[in-house]
């Protein structure tokens, strides 16, 4: 099911937004070039919110320990993380961000 997250203009390029869906937190990321990605908002190395991290066009970096994750796949690209994080399909319709999410 596609869930509406926010207006595209509410998410600035190079930033991430933490969104709670029930007990599950997602990081909705807008890259500096304007692409929008969605992934679990928890570093696989620890209980750290990725949405507070550093965003570039291909990765998000955990602010606490520096683990980087590929935005398209959730694959860890640097230690200390070695487990991937889940990613979710993003849809943009009428300048609104939606995420495909099944509970």
Describe the predicted segments one by one.
Residues 1-8:
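Short amphipathic
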């Amino acid at each position: 099911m596609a869930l509406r997250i926010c207006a595209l203009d509410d998410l600035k390029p190079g930033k991430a937004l933490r969104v709670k869906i029930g007990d599950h937190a997602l990081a909705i990321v807008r890259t500096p070039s304007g692409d929008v990605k969605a992934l679990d908002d928890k570093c696989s190395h620890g209980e750290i919110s990725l949405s507070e991290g550093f965003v570039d066009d291909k990765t998000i970096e955990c602010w606490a320990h520096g683990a980087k994750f590929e935005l398209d796949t959730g694959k860890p690209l640097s230690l200390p993380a070695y487990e991937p994080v889940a990613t979710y399909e993003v849809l943009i319709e009428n300048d609104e961000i939606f995420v495909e999410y099944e509970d």
